[in-house]
């Protein structure tokens, strides 16, 4: 419970502090972009979640996400646009989510996780930067935006694509029961792997943003320094 309180407060209290600071500014910033999470949506294998028609989920991580956004939009700021980015899993070089995926594939464990049908919503780090700059330039945009690539994939496709890019043929699957045991051992949540996050960035696409890395194979090739001719 203490850890959960710390996780929640680390997000809501810092957001409130930023809001209070902006209220005191004589020349407030034109734009306040606050981080959020695509985990706010429910487990979805039946349809994609858009900003307009996505269904909010339940559970601790979802409650954190909701309170985080609530903290941002609780401030009425006449001169500052407020944007909440519901960020999917960020893929980039030098760490982050790529590290465990690469290790699994290298050790021959890069098969599907669980039944492999759960959707994986992701975004390349460069497109996170790209979205931020786009939002800064397009001054009519505000509110909630899904920060995710337009082409999410299921877990089977995710792992198969990574194996192909890394040129490793064997990838043993990890059943759900094994993932749950492993999660307990390393004190994390199996939900991180087994939850189906099917999120699409409808609003930013409608506004005209062009993704640099719309497809997972392109993202993996860039991150791992490989070209399609290799």
What are these regions (language model features)?
Residues 102-110, 118-153:
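Alpha-helical substrate-binding/gating segment
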Residues 191-230:
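C-terminal amphipathic/interface module of NAD(P)-dependent oxidoreductases
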Residues 56-61, 88-95, 115-125:
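Glycine-rich "substrate-gating" loop/helix at the edge of Rossmann-like oxidoreductase active sites
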Residues 35-59:
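Active-site "gating" loop of Rossmann-like NAD(P)-dependent oxidoreductase/epimerase domains
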Residues 125-128, 132, 147, 158, ...:
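Non-catalytic, hydrophobic alpha-helical segments
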Residues 37, 70-93:
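Conserved beta-loop-beta element that borders a ligand/cofactor-binding pocket
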Residues 135-187, 221-230:
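Mid/C-terminal beta-alpha module of Rossmann-like enzyme folds, strongest
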Residues 1-32:
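NAD(P)-cofactor binding segment of oxidoreductase domains
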């Amino acid at each position: 419970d203490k850890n959960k309180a710390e996780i929640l407060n680390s997000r809501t209290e810092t957001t409130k502090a930023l809001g209070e600071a902006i209220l005191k500014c004589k020349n407030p910033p034109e734009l306040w972009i606050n981080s959020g999470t695509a985990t706010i949506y429910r487990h979805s294998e039946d349809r994609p979640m858009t900003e307009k028609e996505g269904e909010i989920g339940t559970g601790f991580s979802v409650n954190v996400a909701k309170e985080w956004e609530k903290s941002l939009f609780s401030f009425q700021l006449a001169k500052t646009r407020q944007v909440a980015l519901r960020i999917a899993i960020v893929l980039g070089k030098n760490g982050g989510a790529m590290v465990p995926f690469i290790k699994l594939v290298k050790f021959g464990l890069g098969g599907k996780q669980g039944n492999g049908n759960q959707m994986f919503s992701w975004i390349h780090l460069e497109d996170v930067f790209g979205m931020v700059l786009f939002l800064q330039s397009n001054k009519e945009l505000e509110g909630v935006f899904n920060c995710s690539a337009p082409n999410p994939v299921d877990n089977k496709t995710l792992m198969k694509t990574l194996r192909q890019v890394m040129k490793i043929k064997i990838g043993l699957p990890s059943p759900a029961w094994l993932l749950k045991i492993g999660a307990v051992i390393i004190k994390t949540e199996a939900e991180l792997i087994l939850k189906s996050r099917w999120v699409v960035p409808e609003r930013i696409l409608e506004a005209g943003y062009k993704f640099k890395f719309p497809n997972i194979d392109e993202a993996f090739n860039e991150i791992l320094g490989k070209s399609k001719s290799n």
